[in-house]
Amino acid sequence: MKKRKNSKYAAWLEQEEFNNQIANAWILLGMAEFHKGDFLGSVSTFNYIARHYAYDPDVVAQCQLWIVRAYAEMGWYYEAEDVLSKVQVDNLSRKHAPLYSSVSADLLIKTKRYREAIPFVKIALPNESKHGNRPRFQYVLAQLYQLNDERELARHAYNKVLKMQPSNEMDFNARLNIAELESSPQDAIKLLKKMVRLDKHKDQLDQIYGTIGNVYLAQKDTVNALENYEQGIAESTQQGSAKAKILITAGDIYYEQRNYIKASPCYKEAAQIL
């Protein structure tokens, strides 16, 4: 009888489910719906779990955070912020606490509050898997610094990305951004020419030469700019937007120079790609 008078024991006794693995199974279902793009379905599932396991504050907080993510993906930012404001962070277990930081960062980035997002990304980053999301979070941090014009911090963060053995695409974009952050055009071109020699970037040569061309163009050096644009067009292995951009930029320069014979085929090929 003494046990029944204990409030914690009474709450435990009144719960509907005594197997905590069932809650995990439900959460996995909600996550699966989210990752399949069924955001409303996942919101419904997480709301059900939160009601069913109202006695478990960690489960409730987890569900609320996934609801925030789903609302944010649908662009329902007011609803997302409303739910986020109700999350009791102290109720999250140590294992799930980083989820609050990553969800907060995601919402702040989606609502273009980049500076506010930085501390949350920095908190979430060390808790991500080294071979999973950590390189991606490090890359996002670098982008946020770059968006806030913190060039040195951005360059340092991008260099950290390169040490994390990221995907080929992320490696390429990080190197490209490092080059673009160089204050000296000569140093930027030197870094970009190093990228040309890396075999793993052979399918992105159009982007690299295009960026070199842009550096020269910013210096009003149209001769070297066109030389690199033409090289990028010749080396392109994919009929994608990168090649189309170079063709249009080269076409614009030729047009301004009244070299219509060279401008016309550039525009024509770009139109076929787009």
Regions found by a protein language model. Give the residues of each.
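Acidic, polar-rich low-complexity tracts and alpha-helical solenoid repeat scaffolds
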Residues: 1-274
